[in-house]
A protein has these predicted regions:
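Alpha-helical transmembrane segments used as membrane anchors
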Residues: 1-133
């Protein structure tokens, strides 16, 4: 449980301290010192997740925090395989729909190089939402 809390804090610190000048998955950086609090891996992680999910990347530390709280409470709920599958499916649908809504809210005219409008997943989900609705 302590490891999960530490992972939550680390991922959140990596996302919050993202800098476009750091070397990451989509850029080589400006050549200066790494500004990300998570170091080189943190810069890479934040770059990848912000490009892939946009602002919805912040849902991942949130779900880890909720999972930590659930473990801390030592929940007596039924924890069958089906319940875990439903929780995972619910989280997946939440992330996909949040990315799509971000894309629709921020508009398709934005520069998606920073992943602002739901990231790459938002482009796919938002385009699908435009076609369907």
């Amino acid at each position: 449980m302590i490891g999960l809390v530490a992972l939550t804090g680390y991922l959140l610190a990596c996302l919050v301290s993202f800098s476009a000048f750091d070397p990451g998955w989509t850029s080589t950086g400006a050549g200066g010192p790494i500004r990300n609090l998570g170091g080189r891996f943190g810069a890479w992680f934040a770059d990848l997740f912000l490009h892939a999910f946009g602002y919805s990347a912040y849902l991942f530390p949130l779900i880890f925090a909720l999972l930590s709280a659930r473990i801390l409470r030592r929940s007596k709920e039924v924890n069958s395989r089906h319940v875990r599958i439903m929780h995972g499916l619910g989280f997946t649908l939440t992330v996909v729909s949040a990315c799509g809504i971000e894309f629709l809210h921020f508009g398709s005219g934005l520069d998606h190089s920073l992943g602002a409008g739901g990231g790459w997943l938002g482009i796919v989900a938002g385009s699908w939402l435009l076609d369907v609705f």
